[in-house]
Curated annotation (Swiss-Prot):
Similarity-based family: Belongs to the RxLR effector family.
GO terms for biological process, alphabetical: effector-mediated perturbation of host process by symbiont
Organism whose genome encodes this protein: Hyaloperonospora arabidopsidis (strain Emoy2)
Quaternary assembly: Monomer. Interacts with defense protein RPP1 from several ecotypes including RPP1-NdA, RPP1-WsB, RPP1-EstA and RPP1-ZdrA, via their leucine-rich repeats (LLRs).
Protein name: Avirulence protein ATR1
């Protein structure tokens, strides 16, 4: 993020413009004659000077094409790996790096080849080598955050294909390391209020575990085995424009089946759902905020459950 400060100094007929990067805490000060600022014909000149800020901020760099693009991105990843970054900085930098990786064809393959051939641990594929390097540099949570925040809007685009390729590589890496579903959900959560049932998050979670049922169970356990939290998250996701109705209905039915298999009669299910709305359960499990179920939502859920339980 760039912040600009503009100060007029009439006594010496000068204008001072300071641009500051929130990423690096670096600042560039520009001094212009006041007449140049007042004359809009000089806008291009002033804008060119202000673009010197790009040297301070990675996401403003003009990335080259061809071999130079590969070299530039490798240099960026290696530089990020050499410096000590706090969690917030890692989140920002990995998102920018991820966007560049999926921006052009075969960047993933070329950069993966570099890390595959580099001294160090052996890898089976180029993609595995790149995924390992990204996780080492930005952490599991950083990589998970990049996946959740960089999915291209057009699922048929080349970028979407590249994003899918990277996600598969990370999921395969985590499986190979023996990560449990709890590990994966905790990485995706990253301490924030995450919509686990959003298409990007849920699809990636399923890639990392064995099935949709395993993904649902991992989310349920993350919510402290609280059905109120679980149903609230599902219903909230259903309101989104990009909601996947099939997946969400299946996730809702999974929760119903859990109680039906325990032989919970409908009245007991209703009382259980209401009980988990109490403050005693609000602080258990995951700390992220959620909206409690409304009375009408509880009534609808109970009605749906009664149809399943009676079958």
């Amino acid at each position: 993020m760039r912040v600009c400060y503009f100060v007029l100094v009439p006594s010496v007929a000068l204008a001072v413009i300071a641009t500051e990067s929130s990423e690096t805490s670096g600042t560039i000060v520009h001094v212009f004659p006041l007449r140049d600022v007042a004359d809009h014909r000089n806008d291009a000149l002033i804008n060119r000077a202000l673009r010197a800020q790009t040297a301070l901020d990675d996401d403003e760099e003009r990335w080259p094409f061809g071999p130079s693009a590969v070299e530039a991105l490798i240099e960026t990843i290696d530089r990020h790996g050499r410096v000590s970054l706090n969690d917030e900085a890692k989140m920002k930098k990995v998102v920018r790096t991820w966007k560049k990786l999926i921006e052009r064809d075969d960047l993933i393959g070329e950069i993966g080849k570099h890390y595959f051939e580099a001294p160090g641990p052996l890898h089976d594929t180029y993609d595995e080598a790149l995924a390992t390097r990204l996780v080492t540099t930005y952490s599991d949570r950083g990589v998970a955050r990049a996946i959740l925040h960089t999915r291209p809007s057009d699922p048929l685009s080349k970028k979407a294909g590249q994003a899918h390729r990277l996600e598969e590589a990370v999921a395969s890496l985590w499986k190979g390391r023996g990560y449990t579903s709890d590990n994966v959900v905790s990485s995706i959560a990253t301490g924030h209020d995450v919509d686990f049932f959003a298409p990007t998050a849920f699809t990636f979670l399923v890639k990392c575990v064995e099935s949709e049922d395993d993904a649902n169970n991992a989310i349920f356990e993350y919510f402290g085995s609280n059905p109120s939290r679980y149903f609230s998250a599902v219903l909230h996701a259903m309101e989104k424009p990009d909601a996947d109705s099939r997946v969400l209905e299946s996730s809702k039915k999974w929760m119903f089946q859990c109680y039906a298999q325990k032989q919970f009669p409908t009245p007991v299910f209703e009382r259980t759902l209401a009980a988990y709305q109490s403050e005693d359960y609000a602080i258990r499990g995951a700390r992220n905020h959620y909206e409690k179920l409304s009375l009408s939502q509880i009534e609808e859920l109970v009605e749906e459950y009664s149809r399943i339980y009676s079958v």
